[in-house]
């Protein structure tokens, strides 16, 4: 028997199991979907530094630019500062994340990108945890 999972939050999680773990990547599903959207001026974004390798991999698959958000937290889910590394002016941005908890990081990143001149922002996430998303401002961010 083998355990299969998609986009583990950290590769080290594989070592927590006594059984073998197949770490599968959601890019095998998301990349063809993104290509089917035929988006012009595409840029791939990570909402935090931890997802930069993932965003870079997607950007290579999709022949797109990549931008990354740098965030600072004071505690827990409280973001005190966020900066964008890269240019999104006139771009259609796909924000890739592995896990959504409160969606605070995603919404702050999407709002920042719109403020910096992005035409649109779409968020694509592997794992959405069952919490309330009632605070989302949904023309700003679309969760796929």
Label the model's feature ranges.
Residues 1-3, 134-140:
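Conserved small/polar residues in nucleotide/adenosyl-binding loops
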Residues 110-133:
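Helical hairpin unit composed of two closely spaced alpha helices linked by a short loop
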Residues 17-19, 62, 117:
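Short, structured coil segments at secondary-structure junctions
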Residues 23-27, 31-33, 37, 49-93, ...:
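Short, glycine/charge-rich flexible loops or terminal/linker lids adjacent to PRPP-binding catalytic cores
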Residues 5, 46, 95-99:
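Generic enzyme active-site microenvironment
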